[in-house]
């Protein structure tokens, strides 16, 4: 029973596994990103929103902002193939202190190729670490992967990817979240949205400046499980300020 409750709580906090699942959306055909805003009234922001994600990060304003204050704690993890991405739900204790508020990591998932771009450069893989505060507000830390040496924490995750859609598995070997991140945590900050329906806005985005590596084999393994690209196209900036 506790395991089922954990799954339910984590799915309720997910980008991809939300009320949006009641309407078919995806990345191909009539359900692709160009059609999201017309699939349901709940998805209207996908078409009409003015602060949508992802974006091309360029001409960022250099300004002093607080360094990322992250804390990590080992605990229960579950890995899900929900048909839109591979997602890892995590237990409590992984926190981000931002704007004098504490955000708790709910899950992290991946997009290939990357959704955000940096100075017009698209990366082969992007990870999103989804944090939520006590009021339900979300902050996303985005991590870029470039092709290079194999990534050991990523290998741990990929070895446990469920092959079937909607398959949920307990993570046998925990994924070292902190080890996924680069040594330098310099970041770009802007206000954006969910990159999947319902495209809700008011999300604090923190895109890490420095990528980490993943091997070509690891990138291809993710793509072969997804069977399609799972990135939303770049959205207009509409005058938003990007802080670096």
Where are these regions (language model features)?
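N-terminal signal peptide c-region/cleavage motif recognized by signal peptidases
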Residues: 13-17
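Sec-dependent signal peptide hydrophobic core
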Residues: 5-10
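Alpha-carbonic anhydrase
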Residues: 3-4, 18-244
